[in-house]
Amino acid sequence: MDICSRNKKLTIRRPAILVALALLLCSCKSTPPESMVTPPAGSKPPATTQQSSQPMRGIWLATVSRLDWPPVSSVNISNPTSRARVQQQAMIDKLDHLQRLGINTVFFQVKPDGTALWPSKILPWSDLMTGKIGENPGYDPLQFMLDEAHKRGMKVHAWFNPYRVSVNTKPGTIRELNSTLSQQPASVYVQHRDWIRTSGDRFVLDPGIPEVQDWITSIVAEVVSRYPVDGVQFDDYFYTESPGSRLNDNETYRKYGGAFASKADWRRNNTQQLIAKVSHTIKSIKPGVEFGVSPAGVWRNRSHDPLGSDTRGAAAYDESYADTRRWVEQGLLDYIAPQIYWPFSRSAARYDVLAKWWADVVKPTRTRLYIGIAFYKVGEPSKIEPDWMINGGVPELKKQLDLNDAVPEISGTILFREDYLNKPQTQQAVSYLQSRWGS
């Protein structure tokens, strides 16, 4: 999920386990023993969680670059108590608004990069609350969100960006990351410099290093074991490259990829291994916690694969090396939430074509299907997608929600993203949502 800008382009309780986790989370080391997070070969995850009878009416709440929260101005408040109060009140106001709209689930970004929005023993504090990496904001944002959302009868899924370490590679960012060397815990950037690569003009972890997979899994385990989250979600950031900033993993491929026919197959196996490890780990700790992924809307185009959709878009399988269809078929996910960010009239990637394609994928499985829709496009002028401008985008939004309600395999909708509920150009659509979903 390209959360930094979200201008998506078409080229688009088992006691033994808990004891082990307690030892892991009390340790200062950032790399857990492999046995703690790696399932036995050939094992399958336990049965998925039971589906709620209530349809998903979700919202993504992004914290990266303070897109939705915390308020940008709050970071300039010098008094920590006053700053925390302002941030907490902003969260309360947002949740009150979401409750009025009928939103029942918040996908809260707790790991936007290589930092955390909870007091982690593995990651340093995020700079998003204070302006400085590693600085304690004086409260626990994840716990505060959980308390306030659950008080309102809303669920919270902890949203992780698994591989991203930073949102840019500027000298100032490097200085900030290096400054954590004297902290506990320090950034993975300084603890494991050999894991770090540059890709898409960001510092990222190399997905092909087995220790990286285990390290990411340990972070998820920390949250699931310590907090009453209702779910865990990974966004669509797997292998994320740009034409001018490709990920150089040639050495990693030479070391670990000998058994694969191609580098692309090896990369897809790496993301597959991470998803499998995280899925098994979550179910071993708390079987009731849901695990899902929100990938790009196109798995593969039919022109490249007869099993693909009748589309011409950037495919997760080929671009991000994420075989999301396979993850569904193997039962690794409780839900999948493809980002179908195009209108019915976009011939290269029609909303209805993709939604029905995904419905067919999940039909023989136990994986639930939620559709991520592009609320950020509502009311925005577009020559390519003019439907978002017609009558404030309400007719297009209504068609998408109607389809989601009509197809039995679709269990709900997630809107991208929260701050767009407050934009002047979306207010007709917000009023429509309240009349449709609100109490």
Curated annotation (Swiss-Prot):
Q: Which GO terms describe its molecular function?
A: hydrolase activity, acting on glycosyl bonds
**What Gene Ontology terms for biological process does this UniProt record contain?**
cell wall organization
The record gives the membrane topology as:
Lipid-anchor
What exactly does this protein do?
Divisome-localized glycosyl hydrolase that cleaves peptide-free (denuded) peptidoglycans. Has either glucosaminidase or muramidase activity.
Please state the gene responsible for encoding this protein. Answer: digH
Listed PANTHER family: GLYCOSYL HYDROLASE DIGH
A single GO cellular-component term from the record reads: cell outer membrane
Alphabetized Pfam families for the sequence:
GHL10
Swiss-Prot/TrEMBL keywords: Cell outer membrane, Cell wall biogenesis/degradation, Glycosidase, Hydrolase, Lipoprotein, Membrane, Palmitate, Signal
From which domain of life does this come?
Bacteria
Q: Where in the cell is it found?
A: Cell outer membrane
Q: What else is known?
A: Overexpression suppresses the chaining phenotype of the tol-pal mutant.
Which stretches does the entry tag as region Disordered? 34-54
Q: Main site of residence?
A: membrane
What span is annotated as the signal peptide, if there is one? 1-27
Provide the top EC class. Answer: hydrolase
Q: What is this protein called?
A: Glycosyl hydrolase DigH
Write down the PROSITE patterns for this protein, in alphabetical order.
PROKAR_LIPOPROTEIN (PS51257)
Q: Which CDD domains match?
A: AmyAc_family (cd00551)
Q: What is its EC number?
A: 3.2.1.-
Q: Where is the lipid attached (N-palmitoyl cysteine)?
A: C28
**Family designation:** Belongs to the glycosyl hydrolase-like 10 (GHL10) family.
Lipid modification (S-diacylglycerol cysteine) maps to: C28
**InterPro entries xref list:** Divisome_Glycosyl_Hydrolase (IPR052177), GHL10 (IPR003790), Glycoside_hydrolase_SF (IPR017853)
